[in-house]
Amino acid sequence: MLKSVGTNGRKVPKIASLCNFLKFNKNIHSNPDFLAIAENWKSYWKSHYPFVKNDKGKKKYILSMFPYPSGLLHIGHVRVYTISDILSRYYRMKGYKVIHPMGWDAFGLPAENAAIENGISASSWTYENIKKMKEQTYHMNIYFDWDREISTCNPDYYKWSQYLFLQMFHKGLAYQAEATVNWDPVDCTVLANEQVDSHGRSWRSGAIVEKKNLRQWFLKISDYSDQLLDDLETLPKWPDKVKKMQRNWIGRTTGFEISFPLLNDKETLTVFTTKPETIIDVSFIALSKNHKLVLLESQKDPSLAEHLRNESLLDKGYQLPCFAKNPVTGKALPIFYAPYVLDCYGTGAVMGAPIHDRRDFEFAKRNNIIFSKESCIGSYFTNEGKELLNHHDSSNLMDIKQKMLQQKIVSYLEEKKLAKRVKNYRLKDWLISRQRFWGTPIPMVHCETCGAVPVPESELPVKLPDLDKIYEKGTSPLSNLETWMKTTCPKCHGPATRETDTMDTFVDSSWYYFRFLDSKNSELPVGLASASSLMPVDIYIGGVEHSILHLLYSRFFSKFMKDIGLWNGDKYLNEPFTQLITQGMVHGLTYTTMSDERILNPKEVQKIGDEYFLISNPKEKVQLSYQKMSKSKHNGVDPIRTIQKYGSDIIRAYIIFSAPVEGVLLWNENAIMGTKRWLTKIWNCVHQLLEREKKMSDAMRQTKLTIVDDHNSRKLESQYNEFISQCSAHYENVFSLNLVISDAMKLTNNIADALKNNKVNIGTIKASLEVLVKCIAPIIPCFSSECWLLLGHNSSVYSNWPISKNKKENMEEPVTIPVQINGKVRFKIEMPKLNDENEILNFVLETNDGKRWLSNKKVLKSFVKQKIISLVTD
């Protein structure tokens, strides 16, 4: 009765023995016991693999960002892992070879802080939490490939983080340097630039970051700046907001470095600018706080040093006791420390041209810098281009195009070797040194004779020592362990000391997706065959908060691992993640007083009629709103308690139905009951069908279970076939997973109506129920499996995916096609195989890239060929 994808010789798991295994009654139940159903099926699946094994199918690598083992999964974890589990179940039903692993991002400050506070080892604390969280995933009914499990604090894993560091060192991409670094005074460790927010606070502790001069280890991510920026264009399945954040962070600008000679000094001051033509209107030079000239003068000028230390003065400028010569006009220019100039931009020095830049204008006004209110650019060059002619007023330059003026000035300065064309990047090298214990040891030793020497690969891993307690912050605890520090120089065999800083934990998480594919490999981080056949990750799911840190570092590592021959990802431009899903947050109901918006504990609130008031003061009104969950807001949800109350199936369905994947989920426990009522309705439909079958004679049953060609039966058959097509599209689109449930509710109502009016053939009703149960099985595994068994099947509900007889073309694999606009390929799209040219054009116009490139343009002509879409616009 149910037409399904064939098993192609794959072995379908039999579950006939489950009838004896399950403990509850199979008679009609108006109220199914969801908790009992879930527990029995989860227990059964511990020893019975629920899916069809298909090692020869097309691969589908589905990965959710692995968690820090804090000891407790929160509702945000439940949401992201539910999404990845649903997709993995769907693609397994489609016959794919699915990779759906899980591991632990286990190094980091929380474990070390907990160890200090509780007087225990960081290792014991971490592994105990991993044990707890694995048990919690069981309650959530998430099916991970636990045979691929990794933990970054395991020496078998961090050995390969050290190996990759050494490969970077040998390639000149890992180096040690003196640097002014970001210092977190609370966690007492260095932070990378990416770990300091726009307000100058630490990403983890929230403390105001200080500056220190330390010798630190860096990874030369800047060497990959162009690749990291340009290859964002090849990621059509990444959210635009994430790509925009990475573009801005990399911050490539093309401009010029111009040298300004210092008066009464042989040195020059190098300035970066994208508008060299404004040099004639420059009134001052502005320097960043950590520019070498500012730091040099602060050593000689106590007032300047105090100015830089005093946070209340940092928004004010300070004039240095030196001047620069304008290389075009010859004018002497005052030099200032200016707070709006960033260390990370260009050379940390900019030209101050108040009539061309608002920030320059405001700074000049605050610091009483004299400048002309109108442009006096009238200077231009002789035909020989060697000397400056007389000054003219600006009207004489009105006919000179800006580009021509820029070219004249640049040519003049280049001839005098005072200017050069450069690309500037906001992205700086990645500082990875951390003054903490619980991290990957940096595999270097320091020798008085040889300097910094790499540990031989044969001696990896450099293991962390066993410590029962960690006592100190501020300097690496490893620096206090003399027996661990003392070693022999691998080069001269003389006495040496180990590097006592550990690596930023983002190093470990920048390549873990490779290790999942070959987690038992003792020779390499990942075998070339495994990486090249199973990478990239097809669907990567995690929070948008990782847009810059983790995702940028992972792209860097992925490209580097290709460069050292660990994978062949040229086809994908060595990008690790094909599709990125940034799921929305979960917000909880928050109670605040109307008068002063004080956050309340729900226990302080009472409901009177339709309004809420303080229990302690019934006249004080309370307002309700949904806000980000946190302990301080008393609006969190214990996912395990909730699952134990309602059952994992109901919670999974509620999470998916309540909001689109990228939308904010407003957690409302009252709405969970609606999901429960829907599943109960399916349960009753199944039992009504079974009851009707039970009353039939054998001959009647044989006839009635055959789908017949009458109007009502054909209508229901058309509805369930359309439902298959819709579900397939929703699962593969991912962002519309919530519509699987809403469409399933509609089909449930149609089936219930068919059972009531008694005008639909019972065989058609059974087929529609089988389709319904199969299509919701990725979301609602235990309940669907139970219904499938009740419908008389002894194979797994996951044995195959049904095919729609209405629109078989919808089940075909989508194709990736480049879109060319006015002769240039602008983007690529993944789309279903469509034959009608208008449908194809409409599909292109509805994509994000289509809207970006075509929203304000009229398509004059379109040419659709087999492998390219070509558009001509006005």
UniProtKB/Swiss-Prot annotation:
Single GO molecular function: ATP binding
Enzyme class, spelled out: ligase
Localization per Swiss-Prot or TrEMBL: Mitochondrion matrix
Residues annotated to bind ATP: K631
EC number assigned by the record: 6.1.1.4
Source domain of life: Eukaryota
Gene3D superfamilies: HUPs, Isoleucyl-tRNA Synthetase, Domain 1
Record field: transmembrane: none
First-listed, main subcellular location of the protein, grouped into a coarse class: mitochondrion
UniProt cross-references to PROSITE patterns, sorted A to Z: AA_TRNA_LIGASE_I (PS00178)
Motif ('HIGH' region): 67-77
UniProt keyword terms in alphabetical order: Aminoacyl-tRNA synthetase, ATP-binding, Ligase, Mitochondrion, Nucleotide-binding, Protein biosynthesis, Transit peptide
SUPFAM superfamilies: Anticodon-binding domain of a subclass of class I aminoacyl-tRNA synthetases (SSF47323), Nucleotidylyl transferase (SSF52374), ValRS/IleRS/LeuRS editing domain (SSF50677)
Residue range covered by the transit peptide: 1-21
Any one Gene Ontology cellular component term annotated for this protein: mitochondrial matrix
Sequence motif 'KMSKS' region, residues: 628-632
Annotated signal peptide: none
Catalytic activity reported: tRNA(Leu) + L-leucine + ATP = L-leucyl-tRNA(Leu) + AMP + diphosphate
NCBIfam families per the UniProt record, alphabetical: leuS_bact (TIGR00396)
Family recorded in the similarity comment: Belongs to the class-I aminoacyl-tRNA synthetase family.
Name of the protein described by the UniProt record: Putative leucine--tRNA ligase, mitochondrial
Lineage: Eukaryota, Fungi, Dikarya, Ascomycota, Taphrinomycotina
